[in-house]
């Protein structure tokens, strides 16, 4: 078990040493050997400015992996793309539609730029979370832009083809542009990920990157894919941006040679997911096992639950209130760690639940 260092790691260095960090979405596993080798080889070579359009082979590999034909532009990361899209397609004071609970930078990209959050809560059913299509229809008239997350962070839902097709119909009826964050797309379990752009190619901007799947968040890079006019609109809000040469080398190695590492990692993540689900069920906590991502969204009996567990269990989790109003009894737990770490964290959480 080779854990990240306490210094130089946001996840492991933010809290005191007696705290187990299961919060920010980093894995504790080292990246694939092929990625490490590609980085070492690139570091011995040219590190100057690359072409603005980036690595051509990498562009083709990304499109092939998603099964899409689209314009593609590199950017410093998916969150940058969210901010740029909000700036490109809305004006201050206007509303931006999204599903809640939602990854906090979605809300920040809207509020930081003086737009209004139009929150459409996911429906919780006995089978898990579902899109509230009726709610989406009611709110769609008030905006031009929908920010979508698929697979969904924090619930781990991988939306099905029927839901995606229905969302596409609503977008067409209401003249919506949809920005779909599909950063976790390869991290699915039983249910495969299907890009929203398969159903709405003319109105979808897809955001992707290697950071979550291959544990490369410290090498920030992403890409926006979609119709050329929409991609060009986003690029106007990414002035003077060049893709990172080391990040491109890592991403290309991941797509070409990272398959065996990803398969083994998904096996461990699936086992961890099932362990957390069994634990939550045995304790009577509200939880639906994620269909994708390595994140567990858990409802507890406690207000300000993350603060409670940090104090009582010395386990750092993401606070539910960061993902939207009304979720302070929830926590997001990152289970992308070694079984020994996860078991110790669950043991500590058990003590706080008694």
From Swiss-Prot:
Activity increases by approximately two-fold in the presence of GCBP. It catalyses: L,L-cystathionine + H2O = L-homocysteine + pyruvate + NH4(+); an S-substituted L-cysteine + H2O = a thiol + pyruvate + NH4(+). GO terms for biological process: amino acid biosynthetic process. Gene3D superfamilies: Aspartate Aminotransferase, domain 1, Type I PLP-dependent aspartate aminotransferase-like (Major domain). Keywords: Amino-acid biosynthesis, Lyase, Pyridoxal phosphate. GO terms for molecular function: cysteine-S-conjugate beta-lyase activity; pyridoxal phosphate binding. Disulfide bonds: none annotated. It holds the Pfam family Aminotran_1_2. InterPro entries: Aminotransferase_I/II_large, Class-II_PLP-Dep_Aminotrans, PyrdxlP-dep_Trfase, PyrdxlP-dep_Trfase_major, PyrdxlP-dep_Trfase_small. Its cofactor is pyridoxal 5'-phosphate. Its EC number is 4.4.1.13. Catalyzes the transformation of cystathionine to homocysteine. Can also use cystine or S-methylcysteine as substrate. Interacts with GCBP (TTHA1554). This is Cystathionine beta-lyase. It comes from Thermus thermophilus (strain ATCC 27634 / DSM 579 / HB8).
């Amino acid at each position: 078990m080779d854990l990240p260092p306490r210094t130089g790691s946001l996840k492991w260095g933010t809290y005191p040493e007696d705290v187990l960090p299961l919060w920010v979405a980093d894995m504790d596993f080292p990246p694939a050997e092929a990625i490490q080798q590609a980085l070492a080889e690139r570091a011995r070579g040219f590190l100057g400015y690359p072409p603005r359009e980036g690595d051509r082979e990498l562009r083709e590999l990304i499109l092939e992996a998603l099964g899409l034909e689209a314009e593609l532009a590199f950017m410093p990361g998916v969150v940058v793309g969210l901010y740029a899209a909000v700036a490109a397609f809305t004006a201050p004071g206007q509303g931006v539609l999204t599903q809640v609970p939602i990854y906090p930078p979605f809300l920040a990209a809207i509020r930081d730029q003086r737009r209004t959050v139009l929150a459409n809560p996911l429906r919780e059913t006995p089978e898990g979370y579902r899109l509230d299509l009726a709610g989406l229809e009611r709110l769609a008239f008030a905006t031009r832009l929908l920010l979508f997350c698929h697979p969904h962070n924090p619930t781990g839902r991988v939306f099905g083809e029927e839901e995606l097709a229905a969302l596409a119909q609503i977008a067409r009826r209401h003249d919506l542009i949809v920005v779909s964050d599909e950063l976790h797309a390869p991290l699915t379990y039983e249910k495969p990920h299907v890009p929203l752009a398969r159903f709405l190619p003319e109105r979808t901007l897809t955001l992707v990157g290697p950071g979550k799947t291959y544990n490369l968040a410290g090498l920030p890079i992403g890409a926006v894919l979609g119709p050329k006019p929409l991609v060009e609109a986003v690029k106007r809000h990414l002035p003077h941006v060049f893709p990172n040469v080391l990040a491109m080398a890592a991403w290309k190695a991941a797509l070409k040679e990272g398959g065996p590492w990803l398969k083994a990692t998904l096996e461990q993540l699936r086992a961890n997911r099932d362990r957390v689900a069994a634990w939550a069920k045995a304790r009577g906590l509200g939880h639906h096992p994620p269909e994708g991502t390595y994140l567990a969204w858990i409802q507890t009996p406690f207000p300000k639950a993350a603060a409670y567990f940090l104090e009582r269990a010395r386990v750092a989790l993401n606070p539910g209130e960061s993902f939207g109003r009304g979720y302070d009894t929830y926590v997001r737990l990152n289970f992308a760690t070694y079984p020994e770490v996860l078991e110790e964290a669950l043991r500590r959480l058990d003590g706080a639940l008694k």
